[in-house]
Amino acid sequence: MMEIPKVNNVDASKAEEVKAAITLGFTADPLIRWIFPDPQKYLRSFAVWMDEFSKPSFENGGVFADENYYGGSLWHPPGIHLDSEILAPTFADIPESRVEHALQFFDELGKYHPDEDHWYLAFIALDPSKQGQGLGSLILKEALKIVDEQGKIAYLESSNPQNMTLYERHGFETMGRVEFGDSPPAHPMIRYPK
């Protein structure tokens, strides 16, 4: 019988492990790879995204990972909002024909963020070799315990339609669908406290 891995709230001493797992998990993400189709540019720019998105998560107890660091999640607590300008240096890695649609895309997604205090799931992903084994669900469940204890809303944007049933099983509801030009869709999703 397979042993159930432990999921923990982790600190910045494990930043590289968590960011590596998430980076691996997004290598085939439809939206992220539409934004960064070139492999080298993906690795370079996604590293910037991981650095910027993980800072507030580590600073505020919003990082969850399994004990082997095959997967992780980055949550931003209520009151934390990243300025999209910090990602501007990565825009040069977006194909020129997609820049305008990508910027429209992010602008439209931003309109779905709840006005109420909420926890924002910026990223959750697993090493692809560990997907489909329930690990993502364990990581999500551990974080949602804290969100529920605080009586807060949880919000995310699903950039991969294959993941939507996972989120729905954990109580998330689809708020809409965002796409521009030939971009893959993203689905903003919200979950009210249980």
Task: Tell where the protein language model's regions lie, with residue ranges.
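C-terminal "cap" of GNAT-fold acetyltransferases
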Residues: 152, 156-161, 180-194
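Conserved active-site alpha-helix within GNAT-family acetyltransferase domains
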Residues: 137, 149-151, 160-177, 181
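Conserved GNAT acetyl-CoA-binding A-motif
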Residues: 117-120, 146-159
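Conserved beta-hairpin
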Residues: 58-73
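A short beta-loop-alpha structural element at the N-terminal edge
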Residues: 6-20, 24, 28
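Active-site rim helix/loop that mediates acceptor-substrate recognition in acyltransferases
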Residues: 39-62
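Conserved acetyl-CoA-binding loop-helix of GNAT-fold acetyltransferases
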Residues: 126, 132-145, 169
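Conserved acyl-donor/pantetheine-binding loop and adjacent beta-alpha core of acyl/acetyltransferases
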Residues: 72-126, 131, 181
